[in-house]
Amino acid sequence: MHLSPQEKDKLLIVTAALLAERRLKRGLRLNHPEAVAWLSFLVIEGARDGQSVAELMAEGSTWLRRDQVMDGVPELIPEVQIEAVFTDGTKLVTLHDPIR
């Protein structure tokens, strides 16, 4: 199987996000890379499901709470930017202050 660098990056995000999801279900708090991967994954999947950029940006601040991440993580992630494939092409989605 031959994957482009972008495809490899997306697979890495998905792998880290699945780990983050498992940890959330067990009640564990996410660290910085896990939180970024989880948020990125939700954007990518939301775009794939047909949500708009505006919908994802509005919902993005509801996906993780401060009590779901380790101390200091919200301050380390003032925004998350992820390119996602929408029905009308690839677009950049920015989540501002995604952990509240």
Curated annotation (Swiss-Prot):
It is found in: Cytoplasm. Pathway: Nitrogen metabolism; urea degradation; CO(2) and NH(3) from urea (urease route): step 1/1. GO terms for molecular function: nickel cation binding; urease activity. It catalyses: urea + 2 H2O + H(+) = hydrogencarbonate + 2 NH4(+). CDD domains: Urease_gamma. Its EC number is 3.5.1.5. PANTHER family: UREASE (PTHR33569:SF1). Heterotrimer of UreA (gamma), UreB (beta) and UreC (alpha) subunits. Three heterotrimers associate to form the active enzyme. This is Urease subunit gamma. The gene is ureA.
